[in-house]
A protein has these predicted regions:
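Non-DNA-binding regulatory cores of transcription-related proteins
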Residues: 1-74
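Active-site phosphate-binding and catalytic loops of NTP-dependent enzymes
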Residues: 77
Length: 77
C-alpha cells in the first residue's frame, strides 16, 4: 500500500507550486511512485521517479497542498 511505501522509503515531502517533491532513501523512489500511481488519487496528474526523488505533479497548487498534507500525515504516523 502507499502507506507502507511512505513509512518504508520516504524521508521528506515538500510542495513546490503544483508539484510535490518526495525525497526517499536510495532506490526508494520507484516503489513510492508506483504505489502513488496505483492509488489513483484524483489530485495527482502523474509521477516521475529518479533514484531517490519522486516528483508528484498535480493539477494546481491547492491540490498539491492536499497531497503534501496527506503524505506528511502518513510519514508522521
Amino acid at each position: 500500500s502507499v502507506e507502507e511505501m511512505i513509512e518504508s522509503f520516504v524521508l521528506r515531502v515538500r510542495q513546490a507550486m503544483n508539484q510535490v517533491v518526495v525525497g526517499t532513501v536510495m532506490g526508494g523512489a520507484q516503489p513510492v511512485a508506483a504505489a502513488l500511481d496505483h492509488e489513483g488519487w484524483p489530485e495527482v496528474v502523474g509521477t516521475v521517479a529518479g533514484d531517490d526523488t519522486v516528483l508528484v505533479i498535480c493539477a494546481d497548487p491547492r491540490r498539491a497542498g492536499e497531497v503534501e498534507s496527506r503524505l506528511r500525515t502518513m510519514l508522521e504516523s
